[in-house]
Amino acid sequence: MKTIGLFFTLLLFITTISAQEKQKQVSFDAKFRKAHQGKVKIEIHEVKELLHIMIAITASGLENDDMVAQTGNYYKDVLKDFEAFKQEPIILTFDSLMKANPLNYIFLTGNTLSYQFKGNKLKADKNYLFPAQNVSSHTTITVNPITTYKKEIEQFAVKTRFRKFYKQHTAFYRQIVADYNNFANLQQQWDWLEKNFNTRVNNYTIMCSPLINGLNYTTSYTDNDFKQIMMVLPPLEKNPALTDKQNQVFNTRIMFTEIDHNYVGAPTKTYKEQINIALQDRHKWVDTTKEGTEYYPNPSRVFDEYMTFTTFYLFCQDAFAGDNAAIKYAYDDINAVLKIRGFMKVQAFNDELLKLKQNNPGKKIDELYPQLIEWCKQQ
């Protein structure tokens, strides 16, 4: 199968557009804040799942098993019920958008939250207005594509009897949510991050789809002093080649390295100028021949990605204390994943951050940045 280098973590920076230019993304009213404060929500959103299915049957989706998870009975069900409609004009339109820029995957699926089904029509959501407007500094949109193609999406849903398909798979969706609640340790991760960083978050929301594979990303929304971290993730995996503990570490890593973007980002912004100097020689830190590294175009983005994964190793030191096998698996896994993706100094970075934390057990990770940046500068 063809891939296009989407096996990496994307962070949607909402700060790349000025307040004057950017349209309002969300509206967290009192009812929303009360319902979500201090809570974790995992959802297979109905309109979002429709768009995942529509993308899955585009030519781009059918040939790309990194963009679309193409294994399991659910994918077989999708093909059985929907592949016959792959020549529909709206599917061809979405395919052309994907071929023009693969990041349209995010703009299409991410903006589905701005609508809910009401019968056969899409009704505007009052809390999520235009949530996915830009991906880093690379691509920005000013018109919600779900609004643009609303009529065609509604017609496709009716023609394919999508809502019946979604209802028939409700039990499967519920099991995905239950697995996250039972095995992902999200509350433990949340508690650890808020203990070790200065950042505070009001709510975590996971938007999941059985059709998500390599393209996982996270973003945050703030309105009325309420901060929500939203992660877009695949279902938890159980690899038969791994032990139960290794599977736990693996699945925790997938989620943790989405969550902690929102914690490492604040001190990175504080020390941006120092980081730009310390990591100015890009070729020391990134193998630019690796596909996907172009989405980390500056020192701050590179530093953040190193921090995201190596902070997970600090978490493992606490979460799996005394379990040397689990900690070693986490260490080897982190180093292998980032090296494959082109972040070749991960092991040294990992070791240095661990040493700093062990030597300064009472300090927040934010406070370790000056020493870590100085170490980077000396490399």
Write out the residue ranges for each language-model feature.
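Long, mid-chain structured domain cores
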Residues: 84-184
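N-terminal mature-domain "stem" immediately C-terminal to a signal peptide or N-terminal signal-anchor/transmembrane
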Residues: 21-122, 340-350, 354, 358-362
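Auxiliary, metal-adjacent structural segments of Zn-dependent hydrolase domains
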Residues: 170-228
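Active-site scaffold of zinc-dependent metalloenzymes
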Residues: 133-137, 217-249
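Pan-zinc metallopeptidase signature
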Residues: 24-26, 310-379
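Bacterial Sec-dependent N-terminal signal peptides
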Residues: 1-27
